């Protein structure tokens, strides 16, 4: 966990273009959480960069090739976030069904408990 410093440094003249995160999600991640996750990660990255003195411009695209010439010209850097978000079963909270060997299912009634693992990377281009 990165905790951005509460005091910010002097503002810089550089703009960083922050592309929408392009994540792949495992099938067991609920669809309504996908955008929430993308938005929270983008906001946290934006906060970190702003605390370092950069001006952040959020771009409504996840592909750097979609940027206009004007956007490329005004940007000092473009930040692209990609990776895979996987929800894995928690072995302590799941049991193996005898009729389906090797498969795990949740013992909860309507929710699956697990650990969210981000196997992504931050690529600066």
UniProtKB/Swiss-Prot annotation:
Asked if the Swiss-Prot or TrEMBL record annotates the protein with the keyword Membrane, the reply is yes
InterPro entries reported for this sequence: NeuraminylLac-bd_hemagglutn, NeuraminylLac-bd_hemagglutn_sf
The organism's place on the tree of life at top rank:
Bacteria
Kindly list the GO CC terms recorded for this protein.
Answer: cell outer membrane
Its annotated compartments are: Cell outer membrane
Q: What kind of membrane protein is this, topologically? A: Lipid-anchor
Q: Where is this region: N-acetyl-neuraminyl-alpha(2,3)-lactose binding motif?
A: 92-97
Listed name of the protein: Neuraminyllactose-binding hemagglutinin
């Amino acid at each position: 966990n990165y905790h951005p410093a509460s005091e910010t440094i002097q503002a810089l003249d550089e703009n960083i273009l922050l592309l929408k995160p392009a994540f792949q999600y495992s099938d067991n991640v609920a669809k309504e959480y996908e955008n929430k996750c993308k938005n929270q990660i983008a906001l946290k990255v934006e906060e970190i960069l702003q605390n370092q003195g950069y001006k952040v411009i959020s771009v409504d695209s996840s592909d750097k090739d979609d940027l206009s010439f004007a956007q490329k010209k005004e940007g000092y850097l473009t930040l692209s976030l990609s990776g895979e978000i996987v929800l894995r079963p928690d072995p302590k909270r799941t049991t193996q069904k005898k009729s389906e060997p090797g498969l795990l299912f949740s013992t909860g009634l309507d929710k699956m408990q697990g650990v969210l693992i981000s196997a992504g990377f931050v690529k600066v281009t």
